[in-house]
């Protein structure tokens, strides 16, 4: 009886400890702590070297993200009044998003991209903005800041027709400015370049090779992968953005890939894809998609860190919103 009682006490203590840990992990940070973490992520650390400082900032930021449901995200996206919008962006996730965009806008304008390099920013989800010595372009831009981003980029690409990868108001704004939009599907009100499977396009000195693959078993030939040669002034740096592609056998770039931008949890055998493609760097993407429920399809920094530890590759990145990455191939072995 004494042994049973002791066991019960131990069990109660364990449950209490787990409960306490859960409460601590879900505790919402103060606005000051959150803003400090955002600054640390965007200005003081990088997604390749997960230092203790970076880890702490990711933990604080994640705690706030965990308190921002998809319903609040939708409400924020629908704010029309400028005063109400400014008020919303003083704190929480809208603050992070506004700070990220302001940083990107300033840095895209002021960053002098040297020959042999490419500047890359993660805007949101799988939406990247890339600046070369000759051009600025976007991939899978999904934002409430339609006009501001449309002014920022020269052309853009869309991997597929899902709402977390495309944004019709943004694409219409691009089209209205006479800027090129690449997509494999028709978009009402957008004068787009209708891309094909196994095709090659050029924009200035940038070469884009497209292939089309599966999203899942039901959505066959649904996602466009973009193999982007950023041009001779970048030493022909190659980006390979595969959107929500989930079949690694369909991911077959022709050139040596510098940066492989992939969905971290779409059913893709990532290690097999890495083994097949042999990229120099891997960007784990599709984290913190706020349109998804917190408990469904919203992958966290913790999820990405666990995946990073499992993968056999020396250069796995976990980029965050607003982070600038200056890539120069010769700086890496």
Each predicted region: which residue ranges?
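Active-site environment of divalent metal-dependent phosphoester hydrolases
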Residues: 145-147, 162-166, 188-190, 201, ...
């Amino acid at each position: 009886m004494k042994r049973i009682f002791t066991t019960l006490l131990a069990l109660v203590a364990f449950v209490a400890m787990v409960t306490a840990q859960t409460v601590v992990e879900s505790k919402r940070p103060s606005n000051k702590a959150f803003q400090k973490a955002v600054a640390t992520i965007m200005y003081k650390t990088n997604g390749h070297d997960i230092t203790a400082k970076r880890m702490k900032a990711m933990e604080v930021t994640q705690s706030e993200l965990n308190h921002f449901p998809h319903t609040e995200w939708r409400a924020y996206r629908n704010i029309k009044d400028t005063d109400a919008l400014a008020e919303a962006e003083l704190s929480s996730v809208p603050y992070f998003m506004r700070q990220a965009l302001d940083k990107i806008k300033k840095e895209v304008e002021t960053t002098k991209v040297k020959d042999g390099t490419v500047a890359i920013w993660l805007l949101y989800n799988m939406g990247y903005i890339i600046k070369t010595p000759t051009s600025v372009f976007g991939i899978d831009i999904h934002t409430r800041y339609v006009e501001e981003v449309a002014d920022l980029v020269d052309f853009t690409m869309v991997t597929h027709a899902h709402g977390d990868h495309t944004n019709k108001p943004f694409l219409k704004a691009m089209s209205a400015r006479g800027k090129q939009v690449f997509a494999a599907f028709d978009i009402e009100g957008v004068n787009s370049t209708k891309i094909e499977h196994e095709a090659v396009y050029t924009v200035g000195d940038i070469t884009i090779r497209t292939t089309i693959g599966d999203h899942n078993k039901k959505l066959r030939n649904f996602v466009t992968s973009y193999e982007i040669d950023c041009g001779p002034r970048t030493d022909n740096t190659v980006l390979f953005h595969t959107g929500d592609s989930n079949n690694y056998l369909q991911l077959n770039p022709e050139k040596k890939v510098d940066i492989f931008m992939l969905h971290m949890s779409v059913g893709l055998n990532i290690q097999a894809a890495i083994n097949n493609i042999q990229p120099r760097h891997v960007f784990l993407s599709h984290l913190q998609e706020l349109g998804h429920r917190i408990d469904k399809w919203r992958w966290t920094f913790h999820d990405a860190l666990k995946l990073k530890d499992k993968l056999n590759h020396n250069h796995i990145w976990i980029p965050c919103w607003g982070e600038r990455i200056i890539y120069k191939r010769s700086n890496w072995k």
